[in-house]
């Protein structure tokens, strides 16, 4: 559903830990 580029950008914006919990549920995926 989402490209790795999107996760990478979020990771740098908030951090792998926060991004995982914030982005995963929002898009319905798990980093």
From Swiss-Prot:
Which coenzymes or cofactors are required? pyridoxal 5'-phosphate
Activity regulation (record text): Inhibited by hydroxylamine, aminooxyacetate, phenylhydrazine and sodium borohydride.
Q: What does its pH dependence look like?
A: Optimum pH is 8 for both directions of the reaction.
Could you say which protein family the record assigns here? Belongs to the aspartate/glutamate racemases family.
Q: Where is the composition biased (Basic and acidic residues)?
A: 7-18
Which reactions appear under catalytic activity for this entry? Answer: L-aspartate = D-aspartate
The annotated region (Disordered) lies at: 1-31
* Thermal dependence of activity, per record: Optimum temperature is 25 degrees Celsius.
- Please give one Gene Ontology molecular function term for this protein: aspartate racemase activity
Keywords, alphabetical: Isomerase, Pyridoxal phosphate
Q: EC number(s) in its UniProt entry?
A: 5.1.1.13
Query: Which EC class is the enzyme in?
Result: isomerase
Q: What are the leading ranks of the lineage?
A: Eukaryota, Metazoa, Spiralia, Lophotrochozoa, Mollusca
Name it: Aspartate racemase
Outline what the protein does.
Highly specific toward aspartate and entirely inactive on glutamate, alanine and serine.
């Amino acid at each position: 559903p989402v490209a790795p580029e999107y996760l990478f950008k979020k990771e740098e914006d908030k951090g792998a830990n926060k991004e995982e919990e914030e982005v995963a549920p929002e898009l319905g995926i798990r980093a």
